[in-house]
Structures are given as C-alpha cells and as structure tokens.
Amino acid sequence: MNNFTVSCNPDTHAPYIQVKVSANDREYVGWGLIDTGCAKSAMTVEVKEYLGFADSEDTHEAYTAGGTVNVPYYFVDITLENNVKVENVMIDLFTSYKNGPKFFIGMDIISKGNLAITNYNGGMIISFEIPSRGTIDFQKM
C-alpha cells in the first residue's frame, strides 16, 4: 500500500515529513514541507549540489509570492514517509531559509492521491495515499 500517516510537530503545526530524493546514484534525506500552495515540488541548492547535478540551462516560469521567476529544474525520484515512491519527478530549485525544509512537496505530487490533515483531541495528523482509493467526504462521515 502506498500511504502514510504521521503526526505533525505540535510546536510548529507545519506538515513536515521525511523525504528522500535520489538521482545520479546518490540519495539525500531531509525534511520536506507539504505545501498545497506550491504548484511544483522543489529542493534547495544544497540538495542539488549533493546529488551531483550541474547548473541547468533548462528553466521554466515559476509563480512565487515574490512574482514570476525563471527557475532551473531537474528530474529525481522521491520517496516519502513509509516508502511511498514517486518516480521521475520534475523538481524546481528554491532558496533555503534558516531552519527551513530541504524540500517542498507540491501539488504536482499531492494531486496524484488523497491528502488529509486532521486535528482531533489536540493531535494533528497527516495522512496521504497514492493513488487515490476514493473520495474523502466529510459530510458523509
């Protein structure tokens, strides 16, 4: 089964998960932020360099909070929590920030499955499955 359920950090309330990215016979493991406001998944320059990618001439437009920018992209395999794999993902670069994630898991991956973030009895839980096994309908629960 390609799914996982993990607890969120109670201090940040941010949906962080462990992410492994593979390319060029190398692997990088770090924290990724599940970001529904991010159209495409992305990695930091640090991860790009660790994976042995050269600077890319291939770019495309990315729409950010700061406006439209041209960003390079690369192809990687991504493994999420519980060994959930997504292969040959076109991933963008983003500028890292202090204590920030190494990855953004964007709608390009999220939209391939079902995502639920729930808060019950004070515990915040992230659940994800890929591919989707059906609709989550809170009105029918």
Give, region by region, the residue ranges found by the protein language model.
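Pepsin/retropepsin-fold aspartyl endopeptidases
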Residues: M1-M141
